[in-house]
Amino acid sequence: MARIAGINIPDHKHTVIALTSIYGIGKTRSQHICAATGIAEHVKISELSEEQIDTLREAVTKFVVEGDLRREVTLSIKRLMDLGTYRGLRHRRGLPVRGQRTKTNARTRKGPRKPIKK
């Protein structure tokens, strides 16, 4: 198994799909990485040489991925909550942040129903 950005990349998958197992790299970004490194998208990771895997590693290090990206996201949410913005309050209360209705929907964000005690 190849190890890129601290993640074991599955050997049996094609390069484009295997790179998406890294948090922060989707299909489009993995296609751009393959084009920039000159590696064909349909080639499996197990068929790549060590030099090609090293070029993939170098290309991935140019992006914010994995732990750094997770930390960046949590810090930006924490910053919104500390500033007391509307979005921060919605995060703090566990409600939808982007303007969705909450009267009937939003069960995923709000959690299971709480019974009304009589």
Swiss-Prot record:
Does the record's keyword annotation contain tRNA-binding?
yes
The domain of life is Bacteria
- Provide the alphabetized UniProt keywords: Ribonucleoprotein, Ribosomal protein, RNA-binding, rRNA-binding, tRNA-binding
Q: Where is this region: Disordered?
A: 91-118
A cellular component term from Gene Ontology for this protein is:
cytosol
Name the GO terms of the biological process aspect. Answer: translation
Sorted alphabetically, which Pfam families does this protein's record hold?
Answer: Ribosomal_S13
Task: Give GO MF terms, alphabetically.
Answer: rRNA binding; structural constituent of ribosome; tRNA binding
State the InterPro entries in the record: Rbsml_uS13_C, Ribosomal_uS13, Ribosomal_uS13-like_H2TH, Ribosomal_uS13_bac-type, Ribosomal_uS13_CS
Q: Which HAMAP family match?
A: Ribosomal_uS13
What the protein does comes down to: Located at the top of the head of the 30S subunit, it contacts several helices of the 16S rRNA. In the 70S ribosome it contacts the 23S rRNA (bridge B1a) and protein L5 of the 50S subunit (bridge B1b), connecting the 2 subunits; these bridges are implicated in subunit movement. Contacts the tRNAs in the A and P-sites.
The record describes its quaternary structure and partners as: Part of the 30S ribosomal subunit. Forms a loose heterodimer with protein S19. Forms two bridges to the 50S subunit in the 70S ribosome.
Which family is it part of? Answer: Belongs to the universal ribosomal protein uS13 family.
Know the name of this protein?
Small ribosomal subunit protein uS13
Q: Gene encoding this polypeptide? A: rpsM
